Design a protein with these regions (language model features):
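NTP/phosphate- and nucleic-acid-binding module
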Residues: 1-517
Length: 517
């Protein structure tokens, strides 16, 4: 199945099973704005809990904060967002559609890379176990030709970004003969910068109102509170401050479902360190964050690091954790060494000292900062994309069928356990309700009695429920039930009194945390 078709199925599945809805749908929707449904909000909360607890519970020197969305407008001048938070945009004169110039070029690079990958995959199928990929890449003429094209374009693109050369970005688009996806033409305007911040007025009258911004990131709320947290918590460097919260960006090119939205949620941690140690801590958090992603069990081959070609104005090192989505490798998390840029800027613009006094060295300094920043919505999409499977199964009648299943890690699954009476009589519904009542304070359970047991299993598979308990006629005799495992479809009988112990152990977040130590 083509990857584009897989992605369309993911989007349709999310709507059909209550994960994600188009916002304001009865009014024909609002572009790049989405709502999370009954299962989506549970998965989202579980992802946030996994991140929050892995930061706060597993690190004694990391604490949390919840800062306001509205902040003093000078904060955004100090941070550089007013002057430098821009995207390079280009319009197609025929379709009147607007695109990010850098994204058009990145997609061209991805197309060249796809050609290389297809050549390698074809050769691998042809030669089987004897295939030497390294040798093939080094000797195959088509691979070498495309690799040279990729290297040349990548180098030219990196220079243009580093120099903020908008004319060169346009020239690359022209030279690569990149066409508008809508019109199919190459009739492009000049490239220009566009600021991404939303603004509004705070105050009762237009004349007396103050222009403020909806925060484009959560990090600045941490920086302006860092000294409050340090002093009130008696924190010693190195220490971190973590936050989960909404951010807003006026993305002109917002697409790929919830991957890029105008209203989104971030999970960020700013780690304050002694100047001179920031790159060591950068490497430490770089490896720790990749480990966090891989602990979910989606395959290490589906992750990679992407070093930044152009560093942001505040950074001296930066790397992205990328995941292989159906539409290619894309960023899910960024790790940045932000130096002392933010705190020094806020010192300058506020006139307040933001220095840390080091009692061991008997000196004061502005700490350097290492940041980890992950998008909740992108992480959500990663989990759904990695978990979605279609497989052929043989039914009890011997007929072939397609089973759609979300193999969400049990600790993140919205519903942990479905309790299903085999029939709606003989006291089975009452027994099922009794079991749910005894478990509902331990984990999220769902009762379902509609349709055949086979259809109910399929429905829970599509939701991503890791375990189903079935109450049948034998339950009345020996107080046992059937427990079915989602991923294997295997079933076994267990005593009712063992349900809590068995399920709780398998859905515990501790199973993920153990992989991080």
């Amino acid at each position: 199945m083509a990857q584009e078709d897989v992605f369309k199925k993911l989007v349709a599945h999310c709507k059909e099973y209550g994960y994600v809805f188009q916002s304001s749908e009865i009014y024909d929707g609002l572009s790049a704005v989405y709502d999370y449904g009954q299962y989506g909000v549970e998965l989202k909360n579980n992802i946030k809990k996994y991140w929050w607890d892995s930061m706060i519970l597993l690190h004694e020197n990391v604490v949390g904060i919840d800062s306001a969305i509205f902040m003093h407008p000078t904060i955004w001048k100090a941070s550089g967002h007013v002057d430098a938070f821009n995207d390079p945009l280009i319009d197609n004169k025929d379709s009147k559609k607007r695109y990010r110039a850098d994204v058009l070029i990145e997609e061209q690079l991805a197309k060249i890379e796809d050609k290389i990958i297809k050549e390698v995959e074809k050769a691998h199928k042809r030669f089987g176990e004897a295939f030497d990929e390294a040798q093939f890449r080094a000797t195959n003429a088509r691979v070498l030709e495309n690799q040279q094209k990729w290297d040349d374009l990548h180098s030219r693109f990196a220079r243009a970004l580093n120099d903020s050369n908008l004319e060169e970005l346009r020239q690359i688009i022209i030279d690569q003969e990149i066409v508008c996806p809508v019109s199919g033409t190459r009739n492009w305007t000049e490239v220009r910068q566009f600021n991404l911040m939303f603004s509004t007025d705070m105050g009762s009258t237009a004349d007396g109102a103050m222009k403020i911004f909806l925060r484009p990131e959560t990090a600045q709320g941490i920086f302006v509170n860092y000294l409050n947290v340090q002093k009130s918590g008696r924190m010693k460097i190195p220490f971190g401050i973590a936050q989960i919260g909404k951010a807003f960006r006026n993305e002109i090119v917002a697409r790929q479902f919830i991957f890029r939205m105008r209203e989104f949620e971030q999970m960020e941690m700013q780690f304050f360190v002694e100047p001179g140690t920031e790159l060591e801590w950068f490497r430490t958090w770089r490896e720790a964050r990749m480990k966090w992603h891989q602990a979910l069990g989606f395959g290490s081959e589906n992750y990679r690091f992407h070093e930044h070609e152009k560093l942001a104005h505040y950074a001296n090192a930066a790397v992205d954790v990328e995941y292989r989505f159906p539409f290619g490798f894309k960023e899910v998390e960024g790790i940045h060494s932000r130096t002392d840029f933010d705190l020094s800027q806020h010192e300058q613009y506020s006139g307040k000292k933001l220095r840390y006094f080091d009692p061991e060295k008997n000196e004061s300094y502005v700490p350097y900062v290492v940041e980890t920043s992950i998008g909740v919505d992108r992480m959500f999409l990663q989990v759904i994309a990695a978990s979605y499977h279609e497989e052929e199964v043989t039914g009890a009648n011997g007929e072939k069928d397609i089973r759609t299943v979300l193999r969400i890690p049990p600790a993140l699954a919205p519903v942990k356990l479905a309790v299903l009476p085999l029939v709606k009589k003989d006291g089975q519904p009452e027994k099922a309700r009794e079991i749910i009542d005894s478990l509902k304070f331990d984990f999220n359970c769902q009762y379902d009695e509609k349709d055949s047991i086979g259809k109910r299993y399929r429905r829970q598979d599509a939701i991503g429920t890791p375990f189903c308990i079935t109450i049948d006629h034998q339950t009345e005799q020996d107080n046992t039930v059937t427990i079915r495992t989602r991923d294997t479809m295997e079933q076994e009988r267990i005593p009712v009194e063992k349900i809590r112990e068995i399920v709780a152990e398998k859905v515990s977040m501790k199973n993920l945390f153990r992989k991080l130590n």
